Amino acid sequence: MTTETTTATATAKIPAPATPYQEDIARYWNNEARPVNLRLGDVDGLYHHHYGIGPVDRAALGDPEHSEYEKKVIAELHRLESAQAEFLMDHLGQAGPDDTLVDAGCGRGGSMVMAHRRFGSRVEGVTLSAAQADFGNRRARELRIDDHVRSRVCNMLDTPFDKGAVTASWNNESTMYVDLHDLFSEHSRFLKVGGRYVTITGCWNPRYGQPSKWVSQINAHFECNIHSRREYLRAMADNRLVPHTIVDLTPDTLPYWELRATSSLVTGIEKAFIESYRDGSFQYVLIAADRV
C-alpha cells in the first residue's frame, strides 16, 4: 500500500504505515495538539517535539508573582528545547550546502529549520503523521526555505533515500516507536561511509534491573516502547554504526522537567520523568556514531 505525494519536482509514492501499530502512532500524532508543543513554538516559530537541557535562567524568569511570569516560563522552556537541538547538531560533524541531512521522526520540523540555518544543507524529514508533515512544510514555505527543507509522510524504516546518499542523520526522541535493529539498518543503508548518526533519547537503565513503574507510565502515555541503553549499543554495532560519543544528559534535562512541572502547560507525565530520572531507572542520553 502506498500514498502519493506531489512535490515541486516530482510525484513520489511513499509507503503508508506498514503495521496496525504504525497506524496507531500516525493517528496519535495527527490528533496531537498539546499547548506545550504549540505555545512554546510560538515564541520564535521553531516548533519542537523534544525536551530541553541546561540550567534554568532564574534571572530571566524574575518574580513568580509578576503578571508576565508564565510567559517567561514558556520562553525559558523553549530556550532549553532549542539548546537541546543545538547540542545534537554539535555532534553531526561537518556538513555543507551540497550535503543532505535526514531527520527521522521530524515532528513539526523545528530542528530541520535549525539544521538548515546552521549548515546550509538540504534537510529531509520523515514522519508517520500527515498533520506534522503539512505543518512543517507550511513553516518552510513561510520561511522561504522550502527548496531546502522538506517533511514527508514516510516510514522511517523504509525511506526513499538512495544508498549512501546522506551525510548525516538523526533521531531526536523518536527511536522508542520502532525496532532498533530495523531502524539502524535503514540509517546504515542511506548514510555514506564515514557519515554521522546521532540520537538523543530516553532509555531505561539496565543497572536498575527492569523498566521501572515510571518508565511503564511513560510508555503508556506516549504509546511507545522505551529501549534500554544496552539495546542501542548492540543494535548499532550490528549495523555498522560505531559509537564514539556517549553523553549522559540526565542531570542536564532534570531542571527542564522541574520547571515544566510548575507551568500551566503540564500534561500529567511530568512526575514520571522527574522521579525516574531521580531514582536512576531512566536516563537521557546522546549517542553519536559513524557509519563504517
From Swiss-Prot:
Coiled coil: none annotated. The keyword Magnesium applies. One of its GO terms (biological process) is terpene metabolic process. InterPro entries: Erg6_SMT_methyltransf (IPR050447), GPPMT_Stmyces (IPR049645), Methyltransf_11 (IPR013216), SAM-dependent_MTases_sf (IPR029063). It catalyses: (2E)-geranyl diphosphate + S-adenosyl-L-methionine = (E)-2-methylgeranyl diphosphate + S-adenosyl-L-homocysteine + H(+). It comes from the Bacteria. Keywords: Magnesium, Methyltransferase, S-adenosyl-L-methionine, Transferase. GO terms for molecular function: C-methyltransferase activity; magnesium ion binding; S-adenosyl-L-methionine binding; S-adenosylmethionine-dependent methyltransferase activity. SUPFAM superfamilies: S-adenosyl-L-methionine-dependent methyltransferases. Its cofactor is Mg(2+). Gene3D superfamilies: Vaccinia Virus protein VP39 (3.40.50.150). Its EC number is 2.1.1.255. PANTHER family: GERANYL DIPHOSPHATE 2-C-METHYLTRANSFERASE, ZGC:194242. Belongs to the geranyl diphosphate 2-C-methyltransferase family. Catalyzes the SAM-dependent methylation of geranyl diphosphate (GPP) to yield (E)-2-methylgeranyl diphosphate (2-MeGPP). This is Geranyl diphosphate 2-C-methyltransferase. It comes from Streptomyces coelicolor (strain ATCC BAA-471 / A3(2) / M145).
